[in-house]
Every structure is written in C-alpha cells, then in structure tokens.
Amino acid sequence: VLPSSDTFLKGSLDSRSGQGLLSRENFPEIGQITAPTGRTGWWDLSSRAYDEVMDLALRRGFYFPSCEIYDGAPAGFWDYGPLGTALKNRFVEAWRRYVVRYDGMVELDGSVIMAKDVFVASGHLESFADPITRCTRCGAVFRADRLLQERTGRIVPERLPDSEIYAMILKESVTCPSCGGQLSEVTRFNMMFRLSVGGEGTEAYLRPETCQSLFVDYLRVYKTGWSKFPLPLCQFGKSFRNEISPRQGLLRLREFYQAEVEVLFDPEEDLDERRWNKLKGQVLRLSQDGESITEVSAEEAWREGLVPLKIEAYYLALIQKFYETIGIDRSKIRLRRLGEDEKPFYARESWDLEVQTSLGWLELVACNYRGDYDLSGHMRVSGKDLTAFNRGRKFVPHVFELSMGVDRSLYVLLEHNLVREGRRKVLKLPPFLAPVQVAVLPLVDRDGLPEKATEVYEMLRVDFDAVYEAGDTIGKRYHMLDEIGVPYCVTVDYQTLQDDTVTVRDRDTTRQERVTISGLKAWLAKALAFPEVR
C-alpha cells in the first residue's frame, strides 16, 4: 500500500537541517541548467527538467542519497526506493528480453571484488585515471576536464597531456568554483577502490567495469560448452569508480549499475547471416563529428565504410533499436564516433550512444571495439592459454562491447516521459516499464466498497505489481497515481456490487471502460505485455 496522497505531496525534509532535500544547498547544480536548442517535449516547457525529475525522485521515493540521515555521508552513493527499484527491474527485464535473449547471449554474474593482477593485465592500474586540479586556497579537488567543459561548453578529451589541460585552464582563466582561488597544475588520480582482503591483507580492488569478470571467466565458459563464435557474454551488476566530484544524482556515481555485453568473435570470420538479416535494415543515426547526424541503414553504414566491421554495425543497430523499443524517440538518439584522443585506452574504435536531454547529449552506452587487448593482456599476466579453436586454427578472440549505464538510462526515461498537462503531471512510461502496473481504488471508503476493492487487489497482486489506494477523493488519487506512472487504475464503485464489473482508467488518455472482474486479469495481461520482438 502506498503512503497517502497527502504524505506524497508534502515531500520530504532533510532531518539534519529541516531544509527540503531539493534545496540549492544540497544540490548546487539545480538552477544552473541551460536547455539545448532544437528540442520538443517536456524540456521545452521549462529549462528545469532536471529539477523536476529530482523533485519527483525524492518526493515519490524513486531514488535518494544513501545514508541521508547521517551528517558527513560521502557523495556519489544513491539508494533506490520502492518505485525506483521496480523501474530498474523492469528496465533490466527489457534489456534481457530485447538484447540478451533476442541475440542468444550468455549471461554471467561475477564477483565485484577482483585480484590485483586482473587490473595489471587490463591496464587499469596504470591508465584508469582522471585529470585533477586542486584549489591552492581552499584545497578543494576538481576534475580538470569537467571544469574546462563547463567553462567553454566544449568536450575536453581526458587523454590530453596534463600540461595541455593546465595550459587551457590558464588560458580560460578558470578558478576554483568554491572560493575563486587559483588552481594547481594538473595531476592524475586513479579511480579504483583498493581493498585489503583477509588477515593477510591481500591487495584487491572493486571492479571499475563489469566486463573484466566476463574476460577472466571466458575460459571456463568456453570449456563448458559455449564454444561457438561469435560468443556474446553479458552481465548486469555493480561497478565502482572513485569519482573526484560526483554530482547530478544518478548521472555521476561512485557505485553504479552496468549492463554490459562483450561479444567475443573470430576476426577472420564474417558475421552469420541469421543475425545480420534481422537488423541490417535498422536505421542508424551516426555522428562522425559530434555536430551533424547521418541517417543510414546498418547495411549501408557498413558497405560505405562509415562503420568498418559488419559485427560492429549489427550491435550498434541492436542497441539503438533497444532504446527505441523502450520508448526513446529516435530523433533524440545519436551514435557519436569518438576521436583518437577521446577513446578509452583499450579501444581501437569507439562510439557512444547518446540521448538528448535537458543537460545536453548524455552518454548512455559506450560501444568499443577492443580488439584482442583484453584477452592478450590476461594471457600475458596469468600465463593461461585463452586462445580459441575455430575451423582448424587457433586464435585470440577479439571483442566488441556494449557498455550500458543503467542508472543514467533510468534518469533519461524519467526525464523523457515526465509530462505536464495543465495542472496534471503524468509520468508516461510505456506500460511494460511502469514500476506500479495497476492500482485498485474503492470509489469511497464505505458501503462495502473497500472490502470488494480489497478482494480485487488480492486477486491481482501476485500476477501484477499492484497497489491498493484509498483515503483521498478519487480525483486526488488519480493525480498522485498519474505522477508515479501507474498506467491503469481499477475503480470499484456501486455498479461493481451489482454486476461484478469495474472501471479501468487509462493514465494517458484518462478514458474509462467497464471490464468484468472475471476478465480483468486477461485484460491487464494484454495491456501490460512487452511489445513483440521483431
């Protein structure tokens, strides 16, 4: 049962200060957002779409700062509440349906704590570092490239030499955002969390990306029967990065969810036609320069050399189609090719799937051709043979990856689907993604209606994510349930007591229809079903 509408509408207060959790003190970036041009939708009504999403998240319990009742809790850690957890689970189920099972992938679940040598082999101990600068007056530490990006509005490649980044800081007269003090020369900070394991104090690390689990587990998977290439391995789980200045809610975290796909393939063998024929006609929105966008089919992109590898074109098509299927407007998506100084240290070629938001273009998926970098590195450090055998020859598998940020994707879903219609706010998530699928409401709290509504709720709660909502006027309850995205409200009224029918209200249209209680499960199952895979 959800808290009352009154409780929801009051919002929540910071127990430490009595201030609203959405105050400027707690979230200094609020109110500093400029909407990019050329967009339609919710963000055109207000440049404060981020504020609206944060307000919704905190008031309704989608997500909120971890350990918020304690002073001094570290930034960059957020907890999902009941609605956020349900939305995350729905999103992951959609990923499993439209990416994992659609392509016949093999899903694993690896440990988040890994041996030091894993990251010696992967290069993370040496190269996984951000450029930082310190204020010489107050001592505050900042990501140097982010400060420059905020000042200039241009992307600053992380791999630029530290001296060049510092020269840009001086040229642009960038000072400390906190106190206006002068900034120090740029140095590097490794973002991995180091651990001491057991009484012996064995050095280990929290994984900075889930894919390393897939690489070190590949040999076991290969030897236990999954030996046909391409071999797409995938994993959903948590990764950890000791970010310098995490902020903006779910967009920059120290602990975060990833859904990663690592496709191991024979570089001398073409992609099978079964896969290719399914997606070669998918329209890709490619941006080679970060400005213009070319719309071209996956097949044309490969034949014209815009995307060098057929397997690369196929998986770019797969991931773009996934976001379109879950309701992201194609016109708000682009696949941006990264320049040489933007690519990760392990990548031969990189694309970012980005979605347009009130904060500008936001990266959701890193799509990298990693070559044999990873498996060759692990062979060298571990001493184990990770070669595969295919058509009479041995080879080191190459890798193409789709590294998805789940938390960021959830933020985008909220922003793109939060709509104001007059005085009504509606979270128009696709019904199959809604955290609460159906609400059961007695028209009034008397005359046997609550008892009958409870019977209906008990009938539905096992098969659907259902809630029972009573107390306020029916209009107030509808408004509250619209805001959290409930697609269907089942109202038990006086006619129900006469003929065993209920009113089903559609969230998006507000239209109502009578449905028999005996046929209600089948009606909801059809209305809430995941779209058919094509």
What are the residue ranges of the model-derived segments?
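Short, positively charged and aromatic/hydrophobic N-terminal segments
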Residues: 3, 7, 14, 21-25, ...
